[in-house]
UniProtKB/Swiss-Prot annotation:
Ca(2+) 2 binds at residues 252, 255, 263, 269, 320. Residues 1-49 form the signal peptide. Pfam families: nos_propeller, nos_propeller_2. It catalyses: N2 + 2 Fe(III)-[cytochrome c] + H2O = nitrous oxide + 2 Fe(II)-[cytochrome c] + 2 H(+). Residues 538-634 are annotated as: COX2-like. Cu cation A1 binds at residues 579, 614, 618, 625. It comes from the Bacteria. This is Nitrous-oxide reductase. Cu cation Z1 binds at residues 322, 378. Predicted to be exported by the Tat system. The position of the signal peptide cleavage has not been experimentally proven. SUPFAM superfamilies: Cupredoxins (SSF49503), Nitrous oxide reductase, N-terminal domain (SSF50974). The gene is nosZ. Ca(2+) 1 binds at residues 450, 465. Keywords: Calcium, Copper, Metal-binding, Oxidoreductase, Periplasm, Signal.
Length: 634
C-alpha cells in the first residue's frame, strides 16, 4: 500500500492501527514541514522539532498564557498548571489529606469538610469554572467526588476549597457541568449508580421500581442541593446549553444491570435531556417528593406507561455512550459512542419541539452521527466549526468538521474527517483552550492519555499518565509536549490568565477563617497582637502571632491528656512569606500564609518536652524559628 493510500485510509477511518502505532511526533513533523508522503531530511526534522519547542517555551521570568486546572482523580486534589509550558504551579487539596498545608488536619479545613472529614480519600474527575454569559468569570471552580458522592467549590482568588456538599440519597457523583448563561446558578451533577430507595438493606434488586438514580442540581452560591430528578437507567456525563434551559446526560446502563455483559446488552442506550425551567415549575407548583431525611425536592423524570415526563426526554443513541459535550457555537450536544465508532449530534434548537410533542420520534433531533474510529470517549472544539474526539482503542485524536458531518448524515458525499493524530496512549478526556465557553480560541488542546508505556523513564510497576499538548492553531494538529502526571487526572480546563484574579496576601476579614476569629473573640483575644494561653477545663487554646523568623510564643505548658488548640496568625505582609507549624511526634502540620489565621487541635498525650518548628522556609533563620510544648504528666 502506498503512503498516499495509507493517508487516505487514516482520514476515512478505514485503517486499524496497532497499539503503539506510528510516532505522533513523526506525523506532526512531517505535516509541519509540508512533506506529507515524502521523506524528511535531517534539516527539515530539526526545523520541525525546533518550531514545536518554541511554541511551548516560556522563558524564565515570563508567564504562561493560560491557567490550566487538572483534576487529581483518586488522589483527591486539583492541580494548577501553566499552559503552554505545562509547568505545575500549585496543588489544591480538596478531598485528600495534605500535610504541607494541613488540609484535612486544620480546624478550618475540617470545618469545610464537615461530617465527611472522616473520609481520607476522594476521586475527583471534572473541574469546571463558573461563568457569566457563557464566559469564565474566574470566581469559582467546582469539582466532583465520585468516591464519596460529594461536590466541592474552590475559590479561585485564594486557590482554596471553601465549600463541600454531600449529595443525599445517591451514590458516585461522576459527570459535572455548570449552567453557562446567564450565569452559573446551578452546578449539575450526575449520580452514576442505581440504588434502592430506601437503601436500608431490605431490597437489592435493581429492577425494582424504587431502584433508581438521580440528576442533581447544586446552588452555586449556597452549595445546597437545589433539586434532584429521578431518571430511568443510570447517568454518566453531562453538559449544559447556552440558553439556560436544557442540560443533557448520557446513560450507559439502560438495562439497569450490575454485570459487564448485562450493561452491554442493548444496542442502544440514550441521552436524557432535562428541561431545567420545567423542573423549576414543577417544584414551584409543589409537584415533588422528598426522600428519607432529606428536604431536597425530588421530581420524577422517568417515563410512565410509555409517556414522557414533563421534565425529561430520552433520545436513543448507539450503545454505552460516555462523554457529553456542548459545541461552543451552542448548536449541538455531542454524545460520544464508546462502544460505537460514532458520535451523535443532537440539535439543541430542535429540543423545544421535542418537548412540545411536535416531533414523531426522539431520534429526529439527531442530525449527525459521524463514524470516527474505535472508542470515541470525549469531544472538544476549536471555535472554528471543528470538533476533536478521543479514540481510546485507536490511540488517536480525530479532527472532524461538524457541519460537514451533518451534511454527510443527509447522504451527501463529504469527507468530514480532517486529520487523525496518534497519541500515547489510550486517550480519555481532551480539552481545548476555552472550549467550555463561547470564547473558544482554537490554540491548544490537551489529550489526557491513560497509559504512558514507553514515553518516560521507568518508575516501577506504577506508571505516570501522559498529558500531551497539541497545537491546533493551524490546519494540522501538531503534538508538541509529553507531560507525565501522577495518578490520575481525568479532565482539565483552561482559562486565560486575565480571567483569574488571585490575592497576593490574605484579607484579615476573609470568611475562610471566620469561625476561628469568632472563637478568639469569645476568648477575648486580639489575634493580631495577643500571645496568650486560655485554659478551659481540659481544653487549652494557645494563641500566638508569627513574623519570620519567630513565633510570638516560644513555649507553653499543658497537662497530659489536654485537648490543645494552637491558633497562629501570620503578621507578615510580604507575599510568599508563608509560615508553617509542626508539633514533632504529634501528627500536627499546617500552613499559615501572610495575614492568615490557622488553627489545629490535638491531644497532648505524651508527657515531656516537645518541640514545634516552622516547616516552611520563610527566612534565613528559618531553622531557628522554633518553640517547645511542655507536657506535665497527668
Amino acid at each position: 500500500m502506498s503512503d498516499k493510500q495509507t493517508d487516505k485510509d487514516e482520514k476515512t477511518g478505514l485503517s486499524r492501527r496497532g497499539f503503539l502505532g506510528a510516532s505522533a511526533l513523526t506525523r506532526s513533523a512531517v505535516a509541519a514541514s509540508g512533506l506529507v508522503g515524502g521523506v524528511m531530511t535531517r534539516d527539515s526534522w530539526a526545523a520541525a522539532a525546533k518550531e514545536a519547542q518554541q511554541k511551548i517555551h516560556v522563558a524564565p521570568g515570563e508567564l504562561d498564557e493560560y491557567y490550566g486546572f487538572w483534576s487529581g482523580g483518586h488522589q483527591g486534589e486539583v492541580r494548577v498548571l501553566g499552559v503552554p509550558s505545562m509547568r505545575e504551579l500549585m496543588r489544591i487539596p480538596v478531598f485528600n489529606v495534605d500535610s504541607a498545608t494541613g488540609w484535612g488536619l486544620t480546624n478550618e479545613s475540617r470545618h469545610i469538610l464537615g461530617d465527611t472529614a472522616k473520609f481520607l480519600n476522594g476521586d475527583c474527575h471534572h473541574p469546571h469554572i463558573s461563568m457569566t454569559d457563557g464566559k469564565y468569570d474566574g470566581k469559582y471552580l467546582f469539582i466532583n467526588d465520585k468516591a464519596n458522592s460529594r461536590v466541592a467549590r474552590i475559590r479561585l482568588d485564594i486557590m482554596k476549597c471553601d465549600k463541600i456538599t454531600t449529595i443525599p440519597n445517591v451514590q458516585a457523583i461522576h459527570g459535572l457541568r455548570l449552567q453557562k448563561v446567564p450565569h452559573t446558578k446551578y452546578v449539575f451533577c450526575n449520580a452514576e449508580f442505581i440504588i434502592p430507595h430506601p437503601n436500608d438493606g431490605k431490597v437489592f434488586d435493581l429492577e425494582d421500581e424504587n431502584s433508581f438514580t438521580m440528576y442533581n442540581a447544586v446552588d452555586a452560591e449556597t452549595m445546597e442541593v437545589a433539586f434532584q430528578v429521578i431518571v430511568d437507567g443510570n447517568l454518566d456525563n453531562t453538559d449544559a446549553d447556552y440558553t439556560g434551559r436544557f442540560t443533557a446526560a448520557t446513560c450507559y446502563n439502560s438495562e439497569k444491570a450490575f454485570d459487564l455483559g448485562g450493561m452491554m446488552r442493548n444496542e442502544r442506550d440514550w441521552v436524557v435531556v432535562f428541561d431545567i425551567s420545567a423542573v423549576e415549575k414543577e417544584i414551584k407548583a409543589g409537584r415533588f417528593i422528598t426522600l428519607g431525611d432529606s428536604k431536597v425536592p425530588v421530581v420524577d423524570g422517568r417515563k410512565k406507561d410509555g409517556k414522557d415526563s414533563v421534565v425529561t426526554r430520552y433520545i436513543p443513541v448507539p450503545k454505552n455512550p460516555h462523554g457529553l459535550n456542548t459545541s461552543t457555537d451552542g448548536k449541538y450536544f455531542i454524545a460520544n459512542g464508546k462502544l460505537s465508532p460514532t458520535c451523535s449530534m443532537i440539535a439543541i434548537d430542535l429540543l423545544p419541539d421535542l418537548f412540545a410533542g411536535k416531533l414523531k420520534d426522539p431520534r429526529d433531533v439527531v442530525v449527525g452521527e459521524p463514524e470516527l474510529g474505535l472508542g470515541p470517549l470525549h469531544t472538544t472544539f476549536d471555535g472554528r466549526g471543528n470538533a476533536y474526539t478521543t479514540l481510546f482503542i485507536d490511540s488517536q485524536v480525530v479532527k472532524w468538521n461538524m457541519e460537514e458531518a451533518r451534511r454527510a448524515y443527509k447522504g451527501e458525499k463529504v469527507n468530514y474527517i480532517k486529520q487523525k493524530l496518534d497519541v500515547h496512549y489510550q486517550p480519555g478526556h481532551l480539552h481545548a483552550s476555552l472550549c467550555e465557553t463561547s470564547e473558544a480560541d482554537g490554540k491548544w488542546l490537551v489529550a489526557l492519555s491513560k497509559f504512558s508505556k514507553d514515553r518516560f523513564l521507568p518508575t516501577g510497576p506504577l506508571h505516570p499518565e501522559n498529558d500531551q499538548l497539541i497545537d491546533i492553531s493551524g490546519d494540522v494538529m501538531k503534538l508538541v509536549h509529553d507531560g507525565p502526571t501522577f495518578a490520575e487526572p481525568h479532565d482539565c480546563i483552561m482559562a486565560r490568565r486575565d480571567q483569574i484574579k488571585t490575592r497576593k496576601i490574605w484579607d484579615r476579614n476573609d470568611p475562610f477563617f471566620a469561625p476561628t476569629v469568632a472563637m478568639a473573640k469569645k476568648d477575648g483575644i486580639n489575634l493580631e497582637e495577643d500571645n496568650k494561653v486560655i485554659r478551659d477545663g481540659n481544653k487549652v487554646r494557645v494563641y500566638m502571632t508569627s513574623m519570620a523568623p519567630a513565633y510570638g510564643l516560644t513555649e507553653f505548658k499543658v497537662k497530659q491528656g489536654n485537648e490543645v488548640t494552637v491558633v497562629i496568625t501570620n503578621m507578615d505582609q510580604i507575599e510568599d512569606v508563608s509560615h508553617g507549624f509542626v508539633m514533632v511526634n504529634h501528627g500536627v502540620s499546617m500552613e499559615i500564609s501572610p495575614q492568615q489565621t490557622s488553627s489545629i487541635t490535638f491531644i497532648a498525650d505524651k508527657p515531656g518536652l516537645h518541640w514545634y518548628y516552622c516547616s516552611w522556609f520563610c527566612h534565613a533563620l528559618h531553622m531557628e524559628m522554633v518553640g517547645r510544648m511542655m507536657v506535665e504528666p497527668a
